[in-house]
Curated annotation (Swiss-Prot):
Transmembrane segments: 535-555
Residue positions the entry lists as glycosylated: 80, 106, 175, 316, 475
Database matches in PANTHER family: PROTEIN CUEBALL (PTHR46513:SF42), VITELLOGENIN RECEPTOR-LIKE PROTEIN-RELATED-RELATED (PTHR46513)
Subcellular location: Cell membrane
InterPro entries in the cross-refs: 6-blade_b-propeller_TolB-like (IPR011042), Cueball_EGF_LRP_Nidogen (IPR050778), EGF-like_dom (IPR000742), LDLR_classB_rpt (IPR000033)
Signal peptide positions on this chain: 1-22
This protein's name: Protein cueball
Organism from which the protein derives: Drosophila persimilis
Role according to the record: Has a role in spermatogenesis and oogenesis.
GO biological process: canonical Wnt signaling pathway; oogenesis; positive regulation of circadian sleep/wake cycle, sleep; spermatogenesis; triglyceride homeostasis
Lineage of producing organism: Eukaryota, Metazoa, Ecdysozoa, Arthropoda, Hexapoda
Length: 647
């Protein structure tokens, strides 16, 4: 990579000529890394875009102001200045470095943080054991103020981080006798120790506004180190990574990963923000093709793999890696966040006010202003004095020309989430962050066809001939060949019945190695049985039909020849008068006797309730018997005579 010689200007302003890159705009870089003698800018694929600050000798910490596209960094050996600002010019393809904080003595900056609302810089001094802050709007010669003095406590402040939304400062105390993680309001009040147990030597720390958590590096005893996280109040502590043979210094977080610099390997490493129980350092190095070369990630379609190492070496560097920052999209991602929306609005108002103060333009400037307003696409806000666009939700790029959902979901529908990140809703049969993983991918072997269930979407395989199993992984030809080879040596071995044809085919080419199994009654087994299911069904239906027909015939005969209701048979016995009434008989002492006494014997009188023998008029009975009457008329006559002729 070719660089033009740098030119020194007053206030240590430096303009380094860079070759004009096709992607050389300020918003193209995603990570900035401080090496010993320069700052390296890389894109999201860790390809080197540019470098800057070559005139410095001992760089360490750095921080990034996304509102004004400024990087603040520290030089440990500069005579006059301690902290500097770096601005990249997109049009000139150059950078300008200016002194921001004057050196006050033999100081050593451990961590650096920036508050975009009040435009204050915060840094820790590991030698003086204090945390300082200063406004970048103040004079360079103005003495910084002390926010926290830890010199009397024996503490050693190391990493610092600003919670812009909740107006707090977090720092790590790396004193091995009593290490802590503490917080304080940016106004200097309400100091709290949020973590003081199960910690050895905390180093770099960062606040993740997207997840409302803090992440820090813990340099453990021996050769071990750990990445840990907790909520902003210190609760819900999690171990993200525990590994060895690293000397990490500073870290940065993005939406889904953590990145840190390692002095031992001179590299940048990454790991997912999700806690992993166990991880092993990857041994696949990234080859450096030239100075400060980084790994180029090929632009290929990701494929599902069985297992991927969580720890990744993303960049090999030619010098010792120290500080690192990442572009988080703070003003785009947190416009709707309940804690950050007010801060984002105030920062935008301040930027608009700064822009309005400088809008004293001529007619030529008005034409230029129109071009500037058209510079930001899709409703982006143009910051004139910084030559950058603040994009609305769902867009990115130097001119907000890139729609984040464009080609993001491979097999699904893309929507912008509440966090302003693209989110995919996958089609049936696909999964993954971008719906790039097919449930059928690599499932069916040996030419099997994969299909999905309609409801459960569970994949299954339709196997070709001579293959079986859930994934068509079982080759029946190979299995049968094994049985038939064993049969050649052991005649009594059992061979599955389906292997007969396969072994017979294989024996044509290798008859000396393959034996054909002989089955008893093979012809009978091969001949299809006549008692198939269709025959059985027809036979059963015939038998049932016969039984039904017999039942109908029997019922018809019973209805036809059903016996009639039994008739009531009557027997009449007529006798002469046995005795005459005596003078003492009265109707109350003896029943009156007719001239002739009658007696009736009734059989089969199931429908009558006659408790005593009634008397009948013999003449009436004779008339009745002479007539052809039915049972009902007989009953009426009997009952009538009982009621009328009892006495």
């Amino acid at each position: 990579m070719l660089w033009c010689p740098s030119v020194l200007v007053p206030l240590i302003a430096v303009a380094a000529c860079l070759p004009v890159l096709a992607i050389g705009t300020p918003l193209e870089w995603e990570f900035a890394i401080t090496l010993k003698s320069k700052i390296l800018f890389v894109d999201e694929f860790w390809r080197t875009l540019a470098s800057a600050a070559h005139e410095f000798d001992e760089l360490s910490a750095l921080t990034f102001d996304e509102t004004e596209e400024l990087i603040y960094f520290n030089d440990q050996q500069h005579r006059n200045g301690s902290i500097f600002s770096l601005r990249r010019d997109a049009l000139m393809a150059s950078h300008i470095a200016e002194q921001a904080i004057q050196r006050t003595g033999n100081e050593s900056v451990g961590g650096l943080a920036y508050d975009p609302l009040n435009r204050n810089l915060f840094w820790s001094d590991t030698l003086q054991k204090k945390i300082f802050f200063a406004s970048i709007d103040s004079k360079v010669t103005e003495t910084p103020k002390v926010l926290v003095d830890l010199s009397q406590e024996g503490a050693r402040p190391d990493g610092v981080a600003v919670d812009v939304c909740r107006r707090k400062l977090y720092w790590t105390n790396s004193n091995i006798t009593h290490p802590t993680v503490e917080s304080i309001d940016l106004a200097g009040t309400n100091r709290q120790v949020i973590i003081d147990t199960d910690i050895d030597m905390p180093r770099g720390i960062v606040v993740d506004q997207l997840s409302d958590r803090i992440f820090w590096i813990d340099d453990l005893k021996g050769v071990f180190f750990a990445l840990k996280s907790a909520r902003l109040d210190g609760s819900d502590r999690q171990l993200v990574l525990h590994d060895k043979h690293h000397e990490p210094l500073n870290l940065a977080v993005t939406n889904d990963a953590i990145y840190w610099t390692d002095k031992t390997t001179k590299a940048v490493w990454s790991h997912p923000k999700v806690p992993i129980v166990k991880a092993t350092t990857t041994t696949s190095p990234v080859k450096a093709e030239e100075e400060d070369a980084t790994e180029t990630i090929p632009d290929i379609e990701p494929e599902p793999v069985a297992e991927v190492s969580a720890l990744l070496r993303v960049a090999n560097l030619s010098e010792e890696a120290r500080g690192i920052v990442a572009r988080t999209g703070f003003y785009q991602r947190l416009q709707k966040d309940e804690h950050c929306a007010n801060i984002v609005r105030k920062v935008k108002e301040r930027l608009d006010l700064m822009t309005k103060k400088k809008q004293m333009r001529s007619l030529v400037d008005e034409k230029t202003a129109q071009l500037e307003r058209d510079h930001c696409l899709n409703g982006g806000t143009y910051i004139a004095d910084r030559v950058l666009c603040i994009c609305p939700t769902g867009f990115k790029g130097s001119r907000c020309e890139i729609r984040e959902c464009h080609n993001f979901c491979v097999h699904g529908t893309c929507e912008i989430s509440d966090r302003a990140y693209p989110k995919c809703y996958c089609q049936p049969g696909f999964s993954g962050e971008r719906c790039e993983i097919s449930k059928c991918s690599g499932l069916c072997l040996n030419g099997g066809h994969c299909k999905l269930e309609d409801i459960s979407e569970k994949p299954s395989c339709e196997c070709p001939h001579n293959f079986a199993g859930e994934r068509c992984e079982q080759n029946s030809t190979e299995i049968c060949a094994l049985f038939c080879r064993l049969l050649k040596h052991e005649a009594d071995i059992y061979v599955p019945f389906g292997c007969h044809d396969i072994c017979e085919e294989l024996a044509k080419d290798a008859s000396d190695k393959i034996a054909i199994p002989q089955y008893h009654h093979l012809e009978v087994c091969m001949t299809p049985s006549p008692w198939t299911s269709n025959v059985i069904i027809v036979l059963v239906l015939g038998i049932v039909s016969c039984f039904f027909l017999v039942a109908v015939i029997v019922h018809g005969f019973r209805r036809l020849y059903k016996p009639k209701r039994p008739r009531i048979r009557k027997t009449f016995v007529v006798r002469k008068q046995a005795r005459t009434n005596s003078s003492g008989d009265t109707p109350l002492t003896n029943r009156p006797l007719a001239t002739e006494q009658c007696e009736i014997t009734i059989e089969n009188c199931c429908n009558m309730n006659i408790c005593e023998t009634p008397c009948f008029d013999p003449k009436l009975v004779e008339q009745t018997l002479a007539k052809s009457s039915n049972c009902k008329e007989d009953k009426k006559i009997l009952i009538h005579n009982m009621d009328d002729d009892l006495y």
